[in-house]
């Protein structure tokens, strides 16, 4: 090594060597200028790899390193370019495709308004408020209305209905008493023959990733909201190319000054990239990816497209396990109104929450949220977007958020029915409901009233009876269409647990009695409301040798030993009901239950069935009473109206159809008698409170007061309420004091409609005397009768006893006991009676 190092400079006698070295080096730099030296170099070659550190080697080493660095830079640039192509493809594949798995939006019912329909001005105000319209003194935007002496003016929101998209409309609704007289388009003074309200968004069916959002295009966001967002989060948004060097420098300076991270430098584009493509990991690699992808996204897409994506993606809170994503859904979640209807202070609150939705949550931390909102307003004032006067006014306002869950709430009971129907109607299509719009029969007014009845009524009953575990279920259905309007599954309506309305299979007690009387009244030649039924002690021997002796609730009997059919049902008497049912035959009564819509597998033809020994859910009971209340037309209960795919394709459309199940005349007579129950029978307390509504109803109490029921019917709905305990222990309540009290609270929270019955063909009102005989004029009472010739009835010479086909014909001595042989004979064909004695029921 030492010899080699010294050898080149030790040859002092040969001056040409340095020249040759110089020429050789210059040749590499420029071969064309030094061709004359080729032969000379070939004769005496010089080693190219010297290991010495002579002065002549240094320039070549620097250039070698530069060349190496250049090659590395080229390779790095190529890799960066290739990686950029990969990132660009990744961005495009999502942004140009399906950006999100949108949740399914579930809407309530669409209310159709027509001139001359029965609805008062006050009812209309309630309906508008339940649909999130706001009463104001002067209308300026959709979703607002004003109230005058006999009219309501409103600006209906634009909405994409299942059959067509309709814009906003200024309309005037004029009322005449309890009727809607006219509907006028205020823009052209033309009258509407048909006008529909946009439905209320009630809840969402989450996407698999647990995110909830409503997509709104850029054009749907108010410009002032965009200005507020940019003023707060990225004021140079329209100038930078995805990353802001100015913001980075400002953040570095602020963080160095503070000695910690106090300010970020991410643009809206970077935030969007992070939310859509990256994790929240704190690393330089993630930040580098974020910046690179932001540059690519900014180059690839317009600023408005980036804003559109950001404003639909940003995280703005939590609803249980689901994330609230985007300003459109957050505006409904916190304020109960669409994003285009937000006031500036409300917009400022949502923009302020972008920095930290949990920290500035207006429900959890209202003070911090207020400070943050006012800071955003101050930024607007400093940037001269608003003036000082407007800032002072807006900053003085309260937060103005609605109660938690006021608009979008889980509605677990109702949604269980919706999901069940979706599965039945759509089959495998139900697996992908992304972006689907589901239109239901949900009535916000009825649901709010039912929830309030449960939340207020059950604690009152708990306190009254000193019980801590009382529960309830409420089902409200349309009287004619069978559409389910409301459903409450327990004393905590929004608790997603045991849905008693659909799952609690309980004995129904005296709610079973109308089916027996309906069976009888379907035979007009034999049974009428003035038919006498035996009311005396009876004993039925069963195949196992046991004797069943049903009793009336008060353990007393009629002095005459008989009672009119109408009074037996009105007073909910046990013994006459059993006598009547056994005379009709258990198979006939069972067949009536099937016609009413009760599942056949829940029916067991044993005598105790006549007093309620059948276990049904509240929604199954609602189906049975809907059939009676509609005049004998059974309409299958349903919560689903239509399902519209994201592309507008109709996946399902319901066409409610009712079918004749029982004779209209028999249903009318039964319903009329149920009106007597409320007027003067076991539900008279309800009738006293609402004397002008002519409500129909039926109480029900099971043995030992374990279950209490009430079926209430007004002019438009059938409502079933149940009160009991999950452990099947006594409630110390009767149907009238338990379930009916919940129904009373339900009525108090909304506006029931009168039940004005219209008799069908061949129904005539006729007078009867004290003995139940028809009279041609006057009479002790007036009863409706199913007959095509009422005059012939009152002209008959002998009216002292019922028609010859009546098995309860009495002799002139009314105390004569009815024959028990038919009832006992009926038991010869009965089986499955083991255990029904313990399921015997009371009368109310």
UniProtKB/Swiss-Prot annotation:
An individual GO BP term: response to antibiotic
EC number in record: 2.4.99.28, 3.4.16.4
Compartmental location: Cell inner membrane
Stretches the record annotates as Membrane association: 88-250
Low complexity bias (residue ranges): 793-825
Residues passing through the membrane, by range: 64-87
Membrane-side (Periplasmic) residue stretches: 88-844
Pathway: Cell wall biogenesis; peptidoglycan biosynthesis
Comp. bias intervals (Basic residues): 11-25, 48-60
UniProt feature, compositional bias: Acidic residues: 30-44
Pfam families per the UniProt record, alphabetical: PBP1_TM, Transgly, Transpeptidase, UB2H
Further remarks about this protein from its record: A third isozyme, Beta, lacking the first 25 N-terminal amino acids of the isoform Alpha and a fourth isozyme, Delta, have been found, but seem to result from the artifactual degradation of the isoform Alpha and isoform Gamma respectively.
Subunit description: Forms a trimeric complex with MipA and MltA. Has also been shown to exist as monomer or homodimer; homodimer of Alpha and Gamma isozymes can be found. Interacts with UvrA, FtsL and FtsN.
Function: Cell wall formation. Synthesis of cross-linked peptidoglycan from the lipid intermediates. The enzyme has a penicillin-insensitive transglycosylase N-terminal domain (formation of linear glycan strands) and a penicillin-sensitive transpeptidase C-terminal domain (cross-linking of the peptide subunits).
Protein name: Penicillin-binding protein 1B
The gene coding this protein: mrcB
């Amino acid at each position: 090594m030492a010899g080699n190092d010294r050898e080149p400079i030790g040859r002092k006698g040969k001056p040409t060597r340095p020249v040759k070295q110089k020429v050789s080096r210059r040749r590499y730099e420029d071969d064309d200028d030094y061709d004359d030296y080729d032969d000379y170099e070939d004769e005496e070659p010089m080693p190219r790899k010297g290991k010495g550190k002579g002065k002549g080697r240094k320039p070549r080493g620097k250039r070698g390193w530069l060349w190496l660095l250049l090659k590395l830079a080229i390779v790095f640039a190529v890799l960066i370019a290739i990686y950029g192509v990969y990132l660009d493809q990744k961005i495009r594949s999502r942004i140009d495709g399906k950006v999100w798995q949108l949740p399914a939006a579930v809407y309530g019912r669409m209310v159709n308004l027509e001139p001359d329909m029965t609805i008062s001005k006050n009812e209309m105000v309630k309906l508008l408020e339940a649909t999130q319209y706001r009463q104001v003194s002067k209308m300026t935007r959709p979703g607002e209305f004003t109230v005058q002496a006999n009219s309501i003016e409103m600006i209906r929101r634009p909405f994409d209905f299942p059959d067509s998209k309709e814009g906003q409309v200024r309309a005037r609704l004029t009322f005449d008493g309890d009727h809607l007289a006219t509907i006028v388009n205020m823009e052209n003074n033309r009258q509407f023959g048909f006008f529909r309200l946009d439905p209320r968004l009630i809840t969402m069916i989450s996407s698999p990733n647990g995110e909830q959002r409503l997509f709104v295009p850029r054009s749907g966001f108010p410009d002032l909201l965009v200005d507020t967002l940019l003023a707060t989060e990225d004021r140079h948004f329209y100038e930078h190319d995805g990353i802001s060097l100015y913001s980075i420098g400002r953040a570095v300076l602020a963080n160095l000054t503070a000695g910690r991270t106090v300010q970020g430098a991410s643009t809206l584009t970077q935030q969007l990239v992070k939310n859509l493509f990256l994790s929240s990991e704190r690393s330089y690699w993630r930040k580098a990816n974020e910046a690179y992808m932001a540059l690519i996204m900014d180059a690839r897409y317009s600023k408005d497209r980036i804003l559109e994506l950001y404003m639909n993606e940003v995280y703005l809170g939590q609803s249980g396990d689901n994330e609230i994503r985007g300003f459109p859904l957050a505006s409904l979640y916190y304020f109960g109104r669409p994003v285009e209807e937000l006031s500036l202070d409300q917009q400022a609150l949502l923009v302020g929450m972008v920095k930290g939705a949990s920290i500035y949550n207006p429900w959890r931390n209202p003070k911090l949220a207020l400070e943050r909102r006012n800071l955003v307003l101050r930024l607007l004032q400093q940037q001269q977007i608003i003036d000082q006067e407007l800032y002072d006014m807006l900053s003085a306002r309260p937060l103005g958020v609605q109660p938690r869950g006021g608009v979008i709430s889980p509605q677990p009971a109702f949604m269980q029915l919706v999901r069940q129907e979706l599965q039945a109607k759509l089959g495998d299509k139900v697996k992908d409901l992304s972006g689907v719009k589901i239109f239901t029969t949900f009535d916000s007014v009825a649901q709010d009233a039912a929830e309030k009845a449960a939340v207020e009524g059950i604690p009152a009953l708990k306190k009254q009876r000193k019980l801590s575990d009382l529960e309830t279920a409420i089902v409200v259905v349309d009287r004619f269409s069978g559409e389910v309007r409301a459903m409450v599954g327990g004393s905590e309506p929004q608790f997603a647990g045991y849905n008693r309305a659909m799952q609690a299979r309980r004995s129904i007690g005296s709610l079973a009695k109308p089916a027996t009387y309906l069976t009888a009244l379907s035979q007009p030649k034999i049974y009428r409301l003035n038919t006498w039924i035996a009311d005396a002690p009876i004993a039925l021997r069963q195949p196992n040798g046991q004797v069943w002796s049903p009793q009336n609730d008060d353990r007393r009997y009629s002095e005459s030993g008989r009672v009119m059919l109408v009074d037996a049902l009105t007073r909910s008497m046990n013994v006459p009901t059993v006598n009547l049912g056994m005379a009709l035959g258990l198979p006939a009564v069972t067949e009536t239950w099937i016609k009413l819509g009760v599942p056949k597998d829940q029916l067991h033809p044993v005598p105790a069935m006549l007093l309620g020994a059948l276990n049904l859910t509240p929604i199954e009971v609602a189906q049975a009473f809907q059939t009676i209340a509609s005049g004998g037309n059974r309409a299958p209960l349903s919560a689903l109206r239509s399902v519209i795919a994201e592309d507008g394709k109709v996946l399902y459309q319901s066409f409610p159809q009712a079918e004749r199940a029982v004779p209209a005349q028999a249903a009318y007579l039964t319903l009329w008698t149920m009106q007597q129950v409320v007027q003067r029978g076991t539900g008279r307390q309800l009738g006293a409170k609402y004397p002008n509504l002519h409500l129909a109803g039926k109480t029900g109490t099971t043995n030992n007061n374990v279950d209490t029921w009430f079926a209430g019917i007004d002019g438009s709905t059938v409502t079933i309420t149940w009160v009991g305990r999950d452990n099947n222990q006594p409630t110390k309540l009767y149907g009238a004091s338990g379930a009916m009290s919940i129904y009373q609270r339900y009525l108090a929270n909304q506006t029931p409609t009168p039940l004005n019955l219209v008799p069908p063909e061949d129904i005539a009102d006729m007078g009867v005397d004290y003995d139940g005989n028809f009279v041609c004029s006057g009479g002790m009472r007036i009863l409706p009768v199913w007959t095509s010739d009422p005059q012939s009835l009152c002209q008959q010479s002998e009216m002292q006893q019922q028609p010859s086909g009546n098995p309860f014909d009495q002799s002139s001595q009314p105390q004569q006991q009815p024959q028990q042989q038919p009832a006992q004979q009926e038991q010869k064909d009965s089986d499955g009676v083991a255990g029904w004695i313990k399921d015997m029921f009371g009368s109310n």
